[in-house]
């Protein structure tokens, strides 16, 4: 007999007789690179739609006009970075400004213009049909700006490393084959000596660090190549630029450390003492060289690095994206939905057509996914969960499921000030075995059979530990 698919019957909603005007003093702004179009209710001005250039003086004039029109709420689309100056000015002037996703406010086809867009935003906001995008507090926004700029510096330095590798390969210097990282101790010593004019492979191989896996003879064989002036010139310039970016990274770390100290100083009273780190390790490549755990603990009152997969640097990046106030999301389900780590159910005809997660460029979600990917190789409860899900439905979905579980742990830790204690992979496997045995016993009883332990010959009647 063919199994019937489960039908989803959503609860019917009662339509109101008329939409209520929740924000009668609302305006809509369509942001552009050269000018902003602003719409206020028609009864507030003889010209309810006006345009303002993007110069600072004109933005203040825009705020003055909204004040004269008795506007209290403002809605605008997230258009590139053009919205940031007007958002900050209006927010500082006391307006309740929300930033909305452009996909959520699409107008009807054939009605796309700057004037109609700002009027559409105004009408939707007056009726309370718009939901503002998340934007953390100003202090966290500044921290986010520093760390996003730091990520840009790292990516730019990475592009320079690729160009140096290209120059080496063009000269048939196979240094990347014998050195895992050409910007490590051994690699940089050899590169600087090559740029300085040294060509003898025996001399260059003496720069080998004792921790390098390749032998000195292997390095000598890799450094016999065809030195050409154009490739040496490219190698020299890229190496000099790489050093510049490393200096910029150091300066950026100083700014981040100072800003963290400023944020932590505003917390009163100070939290309890910092717990002992679960594991002691040196900062990895591209991670800050200063103490990150102490100011983060002062800022949040908890130590997120106690959670498996969330090291100090990941905790810093997460807080710069989500902030410290978890009350912005009513529950962990709202939080994971905002991260696009929750299923997006598509139901038609009473049937569930798809439950895939929504594609997104959410930076916090990317951090959770990367942490989940690394957890698969650990002997922790989260690692055991990842391996169980990966065996059942594949690695891609296991990464999403583990990232969602990590996000819930971070949410509850920050909101309720909980302390995470890892039960270990063995405890998780034992709990999972108990759950599987219980389901097997229930299934056997439903079919009129019993479940017997082959090693002892006893009938399984209850949960097995």
Model-identified regions with their sequence ranges:
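A detector of single, family-specific signature residues
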Residues: 1-465
């Amino acid at each position: 007999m063919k199994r019937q698919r489960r039908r989803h019957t959503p609860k019917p909603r009662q339509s109101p007789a008329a939409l209520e005007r929740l924000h009668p003093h609302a305006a809509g702004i369509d942001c552009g690179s050269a000018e902003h179009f602003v719409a206020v209710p028609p009864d507030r001005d003889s010209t309810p739609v006006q345009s303002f250039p993007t110069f600072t003086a004109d933005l203040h004039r825009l705020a003055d006009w909204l004040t004269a029109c008795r506007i209290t709420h403002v809605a605008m689309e997230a258009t590139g970075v053009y919205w940031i100056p007007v958002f900050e000015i209006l927010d500082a002037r006391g307006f309740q400004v929300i930033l909305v996703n452009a996909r959520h406010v699409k107008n009807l086809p054939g009605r796309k213009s700057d004037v109609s867009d700002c009027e559409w935003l105004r009408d939707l906001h007056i009726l309370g049909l718009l939901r503002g995008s998340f934007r953390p507090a100003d202090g966290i926004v500044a921290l986010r700006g520093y760390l996003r700029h730091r990520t840009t510096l790292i990516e730019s330095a990475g592009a320079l490393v690729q160009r140096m590798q290209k120059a080496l390969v063009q000269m048939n210097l196979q240094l990347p084959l014998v050195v895992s990282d050409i910007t490590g101790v051994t690699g940089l010593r050899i590169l600087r000596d090559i740029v300085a004019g040294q060509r003898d492979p025996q001399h260059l191989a003496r720069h080998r660090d004792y921790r390098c896996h390749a032998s000195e003879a292997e390095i000598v064989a890799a450094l016999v190549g065809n030195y050409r002036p154009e490739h040496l010139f490219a190698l020299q310039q890229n190496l000099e630029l790489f050093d510049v970016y490393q200096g910029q990274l150091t300066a950026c770390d100083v700014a981040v450390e100072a800003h963290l100290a400023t944020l932590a100083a505003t917390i009163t009273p100070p939290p309890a003492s910092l717990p002992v780190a679960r594991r002691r390790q040196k900062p990895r490549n591209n991670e800050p060289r200063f103490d990150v755990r102490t100011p983060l603990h002062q800022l949040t009152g908890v130590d997120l690095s106690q959670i498996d997969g969330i090291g100090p640097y990941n905790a810093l990046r997460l807080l710069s994206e989500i902030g410290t106030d978890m009350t912005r999301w009513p529950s962990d389900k709202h939080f994971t939905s905002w991260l696009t780590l929750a299923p997006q159910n598509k139901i038609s005809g009473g049937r569930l057509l798809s439950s895939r997660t929504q594609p997104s460029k959410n930076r916090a979600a990317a951090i959770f996914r990367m942490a989940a990917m690394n957890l698969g190789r650990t002997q922790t409860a989260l690692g055991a969960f990842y391996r169980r899900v990966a065996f059942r439905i594949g690695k891609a979905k296991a990464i999403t499921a583990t990232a969602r579980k990590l996000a819930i742990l971070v949410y509850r830790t920050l909101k309720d000030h909980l302390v995470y204690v890892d039960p270990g992979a063995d405890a998780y496997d034992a709990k999972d075995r108990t759950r599987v045995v219980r389901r097997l016993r229930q299934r056997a009883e439903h079919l009129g059979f019993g479940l017997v332990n082959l090693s002892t010959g006893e009938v399984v009647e209850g949960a097995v530990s």
